[in-house]
Amino acid sequence: MLTKKIRKLPLALRAKIFPEGRNYVPSLKTPVSNFLVHTKRHCNGGRTVDAGLWLKKHCDKGGKIFFAMAGAGSSFEIGVSLSEMIRAGKIGAISVTGANLEESLYRYLSNKDYAYIPHYDELTRQEEKTFDRVGLRRITTTFLPEEETVRKVLNHFLKLWREAEKTGKYLLWHEYFFELFRRKLVKPGRPEDVKNCWLYQAWLHNIPIFVPGVEDSTMGNIFGYFSYDGVHPFLKKYKQKNPISVNVIGHSFRYMHRLAEWYMDNTKKKGLAFLELGGGISGDFPICVVPHLKKDYLDGHSIKIQEK
């Protein structure tokens, strides 16, 4: 009966409706996928599984994923899975916040020094103050070893920034992190941390990275301090005698230019899958470059040409 009613619809509307069930053949090699396809059929769960099945087909055909990550994914060891995706050739490019970028490096340096507190939501105010007094820094369930990470690499960054200042050249934010690996200035805390550091794997496999909003990170804050050259009556008392030039960092418009070029060079033959974890600028930035290409560079051209 339902099929007869559907046939009465206009073709365009009929094309939006699918019979229940998926064209999926279970495999002994994919027990998790088998379970999800069998149990998650409707609403958000069903849409998520459908997206995953589409993404697998896309990658099986040689397509790449543009991976955008917000929040504290690197602090929570997203590198374990993202690094594997990079090595498998699934990732085309990555857009991340400044905090996610540096946290991947910190996991590389001192993963063994992180600590876990599962019931953080039950902490009292006094307990939180006690953590702060002894120097513990926490993001929800995870304590971050600042002394073993940030302070360990700070002098390397200061030297790189001063070096760029002398030569009159700039690097994009992530390229300074890549320099640490290229020059072998840092070593992993443990051998297995190399495998699980997505930043290191991205450098190793020449994966382009885009970092909008680099200021929102610990090292970004530190650079803001060392480059401050203002005259505020309070802040000027604490500024450096010789502030680092802000021009040693390629600002976000440089990232925008590079991403526009990357899109043009990497979407000619095959489509690009967009996978976003979390909200905010890490996902908004790579998305906004698409209409930027259409409406700014191709302003005045037909919609057909813009879409092409």
Regions found by a protein language model. Give the residues of each.
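Metallocofactor- and cofactor-centric catalytic cores in central/energy metabolism, strongly enriched
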Residues: L2-V153, K159-E163, T167-Y170, F181-L277, ...
